[in-house]
Amino acid sequence: MKNKHSLITALPVLFGFFVMGFCDIVGISSDYVQRTFGWSDVMTGFVPSMVFIWFLFLGIPVGNQMNKWGRKNTVLLSMALTIVGMLLPLIAYNSATCMIAYALLGIGNAILQVSLNPLLSNVITNSSLLTSSLTAGQVIKAISSLVGPEIVLLAIGYFGADKWYYCFPILGAITLLSAIWLLATPIEREKSSGATLSMSNTFALLKDRTILLLFLGIFFIVGVDVATNFISSKLMAVRFGWSDEQVKFAPQVYFLSRTIGALLGAFLLVRIAEMKYFRVNMIACIASLLVLMLVENDIVNLICIGAVGFFASSVFAIIYSMALQARPEKANQISGLMITAVAGGGVVTPAIGLAIGTVGILGGVAVTLLCVLYLTYCAFGIKVVKTQK
């Protein structure tokens, strides 16, 4: 009965993951803004990186401030900023308001990432259910990432390419609904010392070997995600001479497989020990990358790209859950640290570019394999001693 009540209370929290996926409209919308205002390729290319930038600068400070604000209030703040960001272009559509809107969407998303995951632990106290719920959250976010751009295209279809921002009333209404639902749901506030925390207090947690390894684990799983998405289309073009239209199919296979894998993981992690699931998936991921490197067949390579997405899909949630369970009394700071590591994952892309430029496309796959090998070390080398809150 208690678990049933927890799951009902968790629904508005899980719905917040749908809002989290809205930031992915930045990529598709920036193309239309560029045409309207004549932005350079450099300026337009900078826009999507705003999501990573705010993770880097806000992860730890927001994690520290959550001790004062409370997790639920911090989530509500993130949604308020997101709504303001969506209103700006509707009030005044120009280059400046679009840049400010993108910044607010990035800030809101970063704050939401830091606060929503630990808020889930307020209502889901069972460790196996927590990992499964975090995975379910990633599924919901993935669905949102697919739906968001479609809403942009819907607005363009009805109102024209210069009115792409008419998608914001729909996305803003969904965000407002999410905020009202969460506000109306009673969630017991987490216990907090109320002490003022500094950046050094949070970074000191990395002296704990387990937390350090898990921090790097987040870094590298984001690296695997970014790397596979980045390299998949390039690999198909280089190896098989696929056209621009054809290569778009490779990332789609990856994202679809990742979504299916996360959905399956949400069910299996309730029944299977998370470490066992982690280990099996990492071994399968290594095998997929080795086949990708050694076999030159377009169908086999597409299957391998999808397999990497499938087998790596639940790893973020598993590592995040392990970190929260290792030091639950420091959950807010842990969340800030882990989200900061998400920003660091963007470093992997330049490394892949360097590897491709030096030794060819296989060098890029090898960088991805190195990331997976580290995660395999985490799967077999970390022993989390779960402590009580």
What residue ranges belong to the model's regions?
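Cytoplasmic helix-loop-helix junction between adjacent transmembrane helices
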Residues: 101-139
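Central cavity-lining transmembrane alpha-helices of secondary-active solute carriers
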Residues: 46-64, 252-264
